[in-house]
Amino acid sequence: MRIHVFNPEHDLALASNLDNFTAPHAGRELRHDLGFLPALWAGEGEGVLVEDRSAAEYAFGKLGLPLKGSFVTPDELPQLVSDPSFSLQPWGWDRAVRGEFLRLGAPAQGLPDDSYLNFVRQTSHRSWAAEHLLRPLRKVQGTVGEAETGRTLSEVRRFLSVRHHIVLKAPWSSSGRGVRYVSDGTDGAASTFGFTPQLQGWVEHVINRQGAILMEPYYNKVMDFGMEWHCDGKGNVRYCGLSLFKTLKGAYTGNLLADEEEKREKMGQYLNLSILDDVKQKIQELLLTSISNVYCGYLGVDMMIVNTGDSLCVHPCVEMNLRMTMGWVALHLHEISTKPWSDMRISFKNGRYGLELGMKQ
């Protein structure tokens, strides 16, 4: 039996690199409340791990979609993992989710080994995408983007003195929590974004814990978007589609649900679509030569349209998420839906996270 697991703490688990990792409270809440999500794609005879079966059935039932798989709870897992047909499909692979199932009695031979998990972790480091994707993608005409790795506080200060308004990112972080905006004031940005003692402490903490910090110029963003992909681990890469999404303070809030042509039409209002096609082709080439023979699963490359003052350009790799993404969920929802949904949103109401679907007017 294949068991699906929504582990949104994945990015933080990569940072810890521990077999026994306890996520922060917000991450545990997200997993508890949205644990039903894999039921959207789980097939017949497959299970979806949730902490509260009744809550999961209620949340999924509100979507009005047929449930093909079944919800399973932690107390049922020891029996399920002993079945010879057991396999695990998490949101993202890390030592913590493997350790969780090893402690439940899952056979080690059915789970990824250290070599694979180390590959996922190192390739998920923001500096990997900056070096292996962003740098070669910048050769595509109509693109913009720069990212450097800082390993000392003085390197961060030096980058700020040159760029004046910058974005600092922890190498492994999730949904905006590891991102800080900084200005030295010379560009007219609010002084509240200055290099305060609190920010200095955060920078030193990130460097001490993760070994480095990513430094980028601040860009005047017009639109967030991404491209979703799948690698089969055998040298093949498949393009899944465009993801048009929204963020608030760097944290994901929702996705447009539409077919590819409608999304391209929206983006065509801002730029020449040939730029998108060139970026797409280049990413496929880069993924083929770098990870396609090892990584098996979905991944997303986040991008944005940027106003440089002179023109609108594409930042072709803000980050790469080597895991399932909400962008892929949106693509899948649009594919399976028979209803005129317009968008998908992650909400937080009455102390609980939820998935909301908006209808076209």
Model-derived features with residue positions:
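N-terminal-proximal low-complexity accessory segments that begin disordered
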Residues: 1-49
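Conserved N-proximal alpha/beta basic substrate-recognition cap immediately N-terminal to
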Residues: 28-41, 49-159, 174
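C-terminal amphipathic "assembly/sorting" segment characterized by alternating charged
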Residues: 44-50, 341-361
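Phosphate-binding site of ATP-dependent enzymes
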Residues: 164, 195-253, 305-317
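Short, glycine/acidic-enriched loop or turn micro-motifs at the edges of active sites
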Residues: 172, 305, 322
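A long amphipathic alpha-helix within ATP-dependent nucleotide-binding catalytic cores
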Residues: 208-212, 216-220, 239, 251-312, ...
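ATP-dependent carboxylate/phosphate-activation module, predominantly the ATP-grasp catalytic core
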Residues: 229-285, 321-347
